[in-house]
Amino acid sequence: MRNFIAASLIAADFWNLENEFNQLKQTNVEWIHYDIMDGHYVPNITVGSCELDSLINKTSIPIDIHFMVSNPDEIVPIFVDKYKSTTVVNITVHLETCNNIGKLSRLVRKSGIGFGLAVHPLSLIHI
């Protein structure tokens, strides 16, 4: 398994994204990590698909989307359909919020996008 260096968009200057991306091109950053937070699963609210459209148009760096939302089974298919032929290379969802991980994983991977699971540090997992 290969590791990637991903720069989190949440730390970027949103008023100057193009310059931020130009600076990233001079580094070893291989992915841009894009957090989508809904204010329910986590208390913060971040950007959505309109901002992601702008991001895709400003950089060719591959994009990793991390969904911190309470309903990924509903939201992720919309994003997959919209972004399957773009620079989005990976989608990560939280184990605790998925109703059908297998179905969601198959949908994402069938589109050619990688799929990952995140786990809340306090969650108990039985294997």
Task: Describe each model-derived feature in a short phrase.
Residues 1-89, 96-98:
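Conserved N-terminal beta1-alpha1 strand-loop-helix module at the mouth
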Residues 93-95, 118-119:
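Short beta-strand elements of ligand-binding domains
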Residues 106:
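Catalytic pocket-lining loop regions of alpha/beta-barrel enzymes
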Residues 125-127:
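Conserved small/polar residues in nucleotide/adenosyl-binding loops
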Residues 10-15, 113-123:
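Active-site glycine- and acidic-residue-rich loops that bind
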Residues 109:
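Anion (oxyanion) recognition and catalysis
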